């Protein structure tokens, strides 16, 4: 490891798992970026270098292979900001809608929208296990904003809400790299289980991803790098199909009257053996997203407050 110059954070060696994509380097996290780790993207131009989504793996490496001038955060979730405190002198930016989470822990917890008792337990975990520290100097960006790194190298914000209100991807040109963040193409499927999530916004975000023509697509989790538009679209179709599969499972379960609590215990998002602090919260939020839509289109009816059945 070599020391950085001036106030720079120390630079660290490249790893064999790091993958070069033009002037971009995908810094692949532990176990292909499986949660709680993730795949960060470093983009260098003649004038500055930015790091997109500094992950827990970056924090454990103790820095990045180049001096980082700026950090771009796709959205306010603990695994995407775990390396922010590693670069205290780099500026940090997120979409305006998620910016409050970078300013305070209270703002961070507001994005999740957990019940008070759960938030009291989750908050310390975000600090202790994901290195959270407020960045009052963090500033916001909007859809279409472009960060100019010099020499024609640029990073454009692509707002992809649904996962959170501010969730954004980044299109890097002229390399043709599209960082899609948590449109992660995983078998788990789309996550819309927080207070600031929205199922139908997520579906629209998926459709917007289809319109972006790139050479390489980088996910924060699991897949890492997908080369070529056709392969990306095939995997995106499978990812999106998980939403309808969840809805069909829920509809089948509602062949007889069920309460929301029964649906939560039955689960449509997590497998029955998964035990994590936030599972019940995620199931509740996700199921309510589906119920609202199913009631609106008439496939489900509410018999009495909190009890539903397939129409």
Roles of regions detected by a PLM:
Residues 36-37, 56-148:
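Active-site HxH/HxHxD metal-binding segment of metal-dependent hydrolases
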Residues 43, 53, 75, 95, ...:
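Divalent metal-coordination and catalytic microenvironments
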Residues 31-33, 136-138, 159-161:
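Short Gly/Pro-enriched turn/cap motifs at secondary-structure boundaries
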Residues 5, 17-18, 43, 47, ...:
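A structural signal for the main folded, soluble domain(s) of proteins
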Residues 49, 146, 154-242, 260:
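Metallo-beta-lactamase
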Residues 5, 249-311:
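C-terminal regulatory/interaction regions
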Residues 11-63, 169-186:
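Conserved beta-strand hairpin/beta-sheet module of binuclear metal-dependent hydrolase folds
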């Amino acid at each position: 490891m070599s020391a950085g110059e001036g106030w720079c954070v120390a630079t660290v060696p490249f790893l064999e798992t790091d993958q070069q994509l033009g002037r971009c380097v995908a810094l692949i996290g532990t176990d292909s970026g499986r949660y709680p780790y993730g795949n960060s993207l470093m983009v260098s131009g003649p004038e500055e270098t930015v790091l997109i989504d500094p992950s827990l793996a970056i924090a454990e490496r103790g820095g990045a292979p180049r001096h980082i001038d700026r950090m771009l955060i796709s959205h306010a979730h603990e695994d995407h900001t775990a390396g922010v405190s590693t670069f205290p002198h780099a500026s940090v930016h997120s979409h305006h809608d998620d910016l409050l989470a970078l300013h305070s822990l209270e703002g961070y917890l507001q994005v999740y929208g957990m019940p008070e008792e759960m938030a009291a337990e989750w908050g310390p975990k975000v600090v202790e296990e994901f290195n959270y520290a407020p960045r009052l100097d963090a500033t916001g960006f909007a859809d279409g904003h472009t960060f100019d790194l010099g020499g024609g190298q640029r990073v454009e914000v692509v707002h992809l809400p649904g996962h959170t209100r501010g969730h954004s991807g980044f299109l890097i040109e002229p390399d043709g790299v599209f960082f899609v963040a948590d449109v992660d193409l995983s078998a788990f499927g789309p996550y819309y289980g927080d207070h600031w999530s929205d199922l139908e916004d997520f579906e629209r975000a998926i459709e917007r991803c289809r319109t972006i023509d790139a050479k390489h697509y980088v996910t924060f989790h699991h897949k890492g790098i997908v080369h070529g538009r056709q392969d990306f679209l095939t995997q995106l179709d499978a990812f999106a199909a998980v939403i309808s599969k969840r809805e069909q499972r829920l509809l089948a379960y509602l062949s007889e009257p069920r309460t929301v609590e029964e649906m939560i215990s039955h689960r449509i998002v997590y497998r029955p053996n998964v035990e994590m602090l936030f599972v019940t919260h995620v199931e509740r939020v996700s199921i309510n997203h589906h119920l609202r839509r199913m009631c609106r289109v008439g496939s489900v009816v509410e018999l009495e407050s909190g009890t539903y059945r397939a129409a």
